[in-house]
Amino acid sequence: MSISEKPLSELLRPKDFEDFVGQDHIFGNKGILRRTLKTGNMFSSILYGPPGSGKTSVFSLLKRYFNGEVVYLSSTVHGVSEIKNVLKRGEQLRKYGKKLLLFLDEIHRLNKNQQMVLVSHVERGDIVLVATTTENPSFVIVPALLSRCRILYFKKLSDEDLMKILKKATEVLNIDLEESVEKAIVRHSEGDARKLLNTLEIVHQAFKNKRVTLEDLETLLGNVSGYTKESHYDFASAFIKSMRGSDPNAAVYYLVKMIEMGEDPRFIARRMIIFASEDVGLADPNALHIAVSTSIAVEHVGLPECLMNLVECAVYLSLAPKSNSVYLAMKKVQELPVEDVPLFLRNPVTEEMKKRGYGEGYLYPHDFGGFVKTNYLPEKLKNEVIFQPKRVGFEEELFERLRKLWPEKYGGESMAEVRKELEYKGKKIRIVKGDITREEVDAIVNAANEYLKHGGGVAGAIVRAGGSVIQEESDRIVQERGRVPTGEAVVTSAGKLKAKYVIHTVGPVWRGGSHGEDELLYKAVYNALLRAHELKLKSISMPAISTGIFGFPKERAVGIFSKAIRDFIDQHPDTTLEEIRICNIDEETTKIFEEKFSV
């Protein structure tokens, strides 16, 4: 065969370490393969990585550097009989102190019984086995063989790596490509050097003696330029946010389009595993199982069929109840200092440790009905509440368990923790950390929107805890009166809540501060108090209206709350209201009001 007749992938196949592009952790100066082969030795190993990442090219290095006989077999071409012949050859050579290395391409094509033939020969040292696979070794290689081999992970080649290979190839082919064509071919190759070289060969054969334009390339290969790195992140972001927004229609659209434009399905599967914990969490613990199972299915099935697995998972995650309580617990711990572990929780491994008090006083919960009431946190952190479940899905059940186990942290019948108490003209004003839906007051305030649609945030929690009657009464108000203007407040019953009424007040959406937001927030607070006064109530609890998803700056809101409450009391000295509570469940908002609020 002449040079011109050889495939481009063969012409450019690396012959020495310096010829390899990418995989520096393997072929670089400090790479494990380079250091080993330079001594003439090699260990049994599995070369695992995506197509076109350089695995098969290792054979040329083995032939050059390995101090022994090297045999190449492909599992797609050669059967067990040929493998057994090589194993016998290795057994004979070992008797004479010589070595044989079997390079077995695509070992995942062998079934488990065929793979077991290799085990004893690798164990005895009859052969050194170097096998390649594009499939996860944990799934496709029998444990007995896998335990006797080291896995070398080949990474997907970067765009920069592929561009270097492309430049070499265009010199060999003497082909002239526009820069946009080079970039498009690199993107089209998806980290696969073999795919890149095959594409270049097709282009060369179709457009000899011509400068190749992007239009030429797309005529030959179709759309190869549509999915840039920027659009990769844009589509991925839209996909995640659509699932977070519980919209399966949008989520499936972005998912399928990403795959059509060449996205790696494993990337999407990984993102869904993260999403299952970060955005669904313990509201539906099954979400993580489904996401992990989907990732395994993607590895086993591959495209195009695994797209169905991905779509199924995306729909499930989109419709699952949402909670970020796990994520928030993680973030809270990351902000806390490192403290010493209490002595009673330390394991007394030695007598000296016992003398120092390690393990002293520890009570084994299983000997006490499954639960021992004690402080397990470091002493300085004993009052911290790290995990705060949302009142949604399975976390509702977890919350009830926590209330029974740790009433001092999760409130028993009430979650309220009074952080600050003030008095103004005989009226009590309290800054409280807790769940407003459990407040034992005459009325709680809901931070509502103009159409009284109580879907998320505090509004959603109030409806879930109080029942559908709250939303039904709200809908009737809007049907009879129209939308509720920003700054105004209306009243419904409280359903199953401990409070008698819910006062729905509409706070402003923050738009920079130049659209009357301060005045509207003042009115929202004032009118909520006014509705309670009109009903001759004695106590009211309200959240930090507009400071959540409406984005009103919290520190700015404190002063407005203070003025509205003070003005209301001044202007209604005969009010029946005796207690005004500002209740928030999150620590940040509570702390800001605790530190800044004054009358």
From Swiss-Prot:
Keyword tRNA processing among record annotations: no
Keywords, sorted A to Z: ATP-binding, Nucleotide-binding
The UniProt record lists the keyword Nucleotide-binding: yes
InterPro entries: AAA+_ATPase, AAA_assoc_2, AAA_ATPase_RarA/MGS1/WRNIP1, DNA_pol3_clamp-load_cplx_C, Macro_dom, Macro_dom-like, MgsA_C, P-loop_NTPase
Domain named Macro: residues: 416-599
GO aspect biological process, one term: DNA recombination
Any Pfam family hit: MgsA_C
Residues where ATP binds: 49-56
PROSITE patterns reported for this sequence: MACRO
Gene Ontology molecular function: ATP binding; ATP hydrolysis activity; DNA binding; enzyme activator activity; four-way junction helicase activity; single-stranded DNA helicase activity
Membership in a protein family: In the N-terminal section; belongs to the AAA ATPase family. RarA/MGS1/WRNIP1 subfamily.
Protein name in the entry: Uncharacterized protein TM_0508
Organism: Thermotoga maritima (strain ATCC 43589 / DSM 3109 / JCM 10099 / NBRC 100826 / MSB8)
Lineage: Bacteria, Thermotogati, Thermotogota, Thermotogae, Thermotogales
